[in-house]
């Protein structure tokens, strides 16, 4: 579902991607965390008036999916179709994800272009045939270096384990085709040096730089021990390595070798959002592939941390995954979208707890934000019959609100729009919400209302206009994060008849004071954040 909003035409799109997710099981909170972050980022840029392209999708080839399908008694394609149709796409719709495209690596628009890309590298001499033997993790779909492996304990005693999946690796020996990745070490290091923000956060950048400095090995880009994948075009006994196949979705989805106009106006991505466990594929292999093909590199690779449950990474393979619907049923979709970006600094690991979510929901959403909206609408209804009065008695207190809004808009726009500091941007807006609450507490409009003098009436009108106009700006700033409740607030303020659709309001202009006209019809709608029910039994 694409979000609405006016966009600049003709310019290159601000292009953001999530990883394409494995369809070996249904999505969990970790997948939704990255996808919501990308949705907020692209909605924010769309509300800057920019042309935007947001891509997500599913990775449907490889040994892991083949084995999962076999275990469920179906073909890999049937398994992928079932998961995409019943789990992945419905969840993104449920979470109000406004992606512009959903690519599947089994689609012909992808597989044909993957073969063309790899054939071109082969023709250029970038790919050669060789043999390889080494420890292989099926979960990662990757050969591991011996030094990366963990010593097994308990049921895995005496075996070597993948450091990510904590499962035994398999020793594979096969004849493969190799990409000359080792020849790109210096070029990659030069790019990291010239573009210090290419990999974020800094800890991720340091990991990548240190890994490349140790020297890169050539990359095995084909497999011959199974057949669920894209065939190597010049040797159908091999299928293309699933990660080479998967990474190319960022090009094939926007018209590589098929729609030059679309490709030139979209590629490369401005931001690839990835989990830190797949950082090396995106920050090393992907740019090297693009260099080999003479294509431009992405703007930045932003690695988010892991969501932890009981001290372990949340994942499908260790069964710590929690369904997002378990939370949205209780807290609502908008609160869900807000919580993880508010509670966890993007790029760092973070722990989820039901208790923390409940506490933040009650304190920040219900008490601070929702209660402010409810109080202001109620007072405009009580004292002015629901018609927003004009402000004619501005003073220092109102100027402080104007200044606070200017600061909040600039800070939120910089932090979310440029730095991907979603937590910092959300805090900037909610600090302003607290400032407006403090303003109402200090100005005591319920007491001012008892003064029937012209001065008293003007003062009351000014207080309530100031609060309502502040909420107008808050609705604009929070729309990329909580679109449903922001629309409810926009409707409550009676803003649309004079200002137009909420999606068309530019975030960078939200501090322009006085946009909400006197005379707007303010109504007290439904409570934005209802009181929570008791936590359901486990």
Swiss-Prot record:
Question: Per its UniProt entry, what is the enzyme's top EC class, as one word?
Answer: ligase
Pfam families per UniProt = Anticodon_3, tRNA-synt_1g
- Binding positions (Zn(2+)): 137, 140, 162, 165
Q: Which GO terms describe its biological process?
A: methionyl-tRNA aminoacylation
Q: Which Gene3D superfamilies match?
A: 2.170.220.10, HUPs, Isoleucyl-tRNA Synthetase, Domain 1
GO MF, one term, reads: methionine-tRNA ligase activity
Chief place of localization: cytoplasm
Q: According to its record, what are the GO cellular component terms?
A: cytoplasm
Q: What is this protein called?
A: Methionine--tRNA ligase
Localization per Swiss-Prot or TrEMBL: Cytoplasm
Record EC number:
6.1.1.10
Motif 'HIGH' region: where in chain: 21-31
State the span of motif ('KMSKS' region): 313-317
HAMAP family reported for this sequence: Met_tRNA_synth_type2
Supply the alphabetized keyword list.
Aminoacyl-tRNA synthetase, ATP-binding, Cytoplasm, Ligase, Metal-binding, Nucleotide-binding, Protein biosynthesis, Zinc
Domain of life (superkingdom): Bacteria
**Cofactor binding, per record:** Binds 1 zinc ion per subunit.
Q: Which cofactor does it need?
A: Zn(2+)
Looking up SUPFAM superfamilies in the UniProt record yields: Anticodon-binding domain of a subclass of class I aminoacyl-tRNA synthetases, Nucleotidylyl transferase
**What role does this protein play?**
Is required not only for elongation of protein synthesis but also for the initiation of all mRNA translation through initiator tRNA(fMet) aminoacylation.
Recorded catalytic activity of this chain's protein: tRNA(Met) + L-methionine + ATP = L-methionyl-tRNA(Met) + AMP + diphosphate
Assembly = Monomer.
Question: Can you tell me which residues bind ATP?
Answer: 316
């Amino acid at each position: 579902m694409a979000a609405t909003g006016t966009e600049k035409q003709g310019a290159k799109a601000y292009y953001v991607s999530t990883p394409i997710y494995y369809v070996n099981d249904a999505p969990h909170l970790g997948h939704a965390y990255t996808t919501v972050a990308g949705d907020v980022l692209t909605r924010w840029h769309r509300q800057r008036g920019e042309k935007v392209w947001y891509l997500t999708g599913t990775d449907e080839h490889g040994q892991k999916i083949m084995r999962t399908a076999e275990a469920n008694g179906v073909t890999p394609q049937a398994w992928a179709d079932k998961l995409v149709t019943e789990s992945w796409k419905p969840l993104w719709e449920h979470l109000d994800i406004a992606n512009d495209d959903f690519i599947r690596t089994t689609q012909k628009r992808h597989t044909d272009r993957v073969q063309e890309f790899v054939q071109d590298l082969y023709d250029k001499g970038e790919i050669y045939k060789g043999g390889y033997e080494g420890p292989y993790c099926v979960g990662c779909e990757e050969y591991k270096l011996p030094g990366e492996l963990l010593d097994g304990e308990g049921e895995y005693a005496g075996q070597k384990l993948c450091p990510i999946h904590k499962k035994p690796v398999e020793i594979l020996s096969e004849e493969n085709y190799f990409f000359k990745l080792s020849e790109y070490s210096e070029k990659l290091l030069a790019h990291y040096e010239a573009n210090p923000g290419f990999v974020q956060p800094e800890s991720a950048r340091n990991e990548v730089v240190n890994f490349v400095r140790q020297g890169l090995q050539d990359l095995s880009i084909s497999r011959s021990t199974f057949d669920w994948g894209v065939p190597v075009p010049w040797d159908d006994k091999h299928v293309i390595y699933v990660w080479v196949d998967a990474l190319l979705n960022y090009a094939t989805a926007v018209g590589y070798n098929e729609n030059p106009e679309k490709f030139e106006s979209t590629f490369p991505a401005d931001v690839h959002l990835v989990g830190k466990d797949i950082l090396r594929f995106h920050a090393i292999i992907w740019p090297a592939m693009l260099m080999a093909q003479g294509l431009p590199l992405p703007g930045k690779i932003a690695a988010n941390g892991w969501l932890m449950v009981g001290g372990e990474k949340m994942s499908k393979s260790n069964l710590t995954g929690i369904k997002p619907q378990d939370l949205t049923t209780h807290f609502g979709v908008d609160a869900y979208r807000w919580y993880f970006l508010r509670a966890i600094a993007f790029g760092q690991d973070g722990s989820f707890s039901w208790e923390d979510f409940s506490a933040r929901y009650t304190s920040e959403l219900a008490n601070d934000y929702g209660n402010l909206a409810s109080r202001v609408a109620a007072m405009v209804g009580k004292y002015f019959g629901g018609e927003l009065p004009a402000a004619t008695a501005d003073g220092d207190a109102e100027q402080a609100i104007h200044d606070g809004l200017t600061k909040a808009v600039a800070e939120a726009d910089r932090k979310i729009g440029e730095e991907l500091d979603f937590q910092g941007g959300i805090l900037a807006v909610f600090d302003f919400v607290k400032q407006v609450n403090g303003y109402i507490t200090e100005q005591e409009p319920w007491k001012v209302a008892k003064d029937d003098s012209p001065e008293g009436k003007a003062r009351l009108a000014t207080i309530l206009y100031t609060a309502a106009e502040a909420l107008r700006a808050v609705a604009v700033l929070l729309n990329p994060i909580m679109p449903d409740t922001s629309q409810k607030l926009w409707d409550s303020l009676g803003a649309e008849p004079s200002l137009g659709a909420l999606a068309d309001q530019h975030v960078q202009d939200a501090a322009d004071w006085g946009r909400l006209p006197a005379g707007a019809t303010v109504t007290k709608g439904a409570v934005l954040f209802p009181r929570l029910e008791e936590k359901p039994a486990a």
